[in-house]
Amino acid sequence: RTRAEIESMYWSICREVNSMAKTMKHMPDELRGLDKMLADKYFCNFSLFQSLPDAWAIDQLFPIVPIQRLDERPTRNATLQDITCDSDGKIANFVTNRQASHVLPVHSIKKNEEYYLGVFLVGAYQEILGDMHNLFGDTNAVHISVKDDTYHIDQIFDGETVEEVLDYVQYNPK
């Protein structure tokens, strides 16, 4: 019990120091990693190795943003984890406000809420590299064009079903 209380105090102090550090004109180097250390881990329903292999292999940055609750300012910071068997897929480098960051601004997740993030500028190259890693299959994809202040959904591509993915590896559950 005492250890849990001390750990709770430690994290509270870290959050307070981080909050104060953000107001400093010149932040000490020792405090620069607090944002990353305090970031939430958001587990996402995808495989990093399949969907964004260049983010894993060469640390390529892809624009990632929440695509809902756009009228609310994000109040949390997070890193992203995939849900593969080892949860080895982690994104901890992001583009925010035209600069690199170790955390992604996100909203607190509400009870029973499905929270969606969009990953942009991925393209077919990433899909070809990712192939069938972890048997996730192809994900749904959308082509959108933007002109002036409006957008148009040009095409919607359905992802693969579990049955289709299992068929690739000659598995027939019947």
Where are these regions (language model features)?
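Charged (often Lys/Glu-rich) extended helix/loop segments that serve as interaction or gating elements
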Residues: 1-174
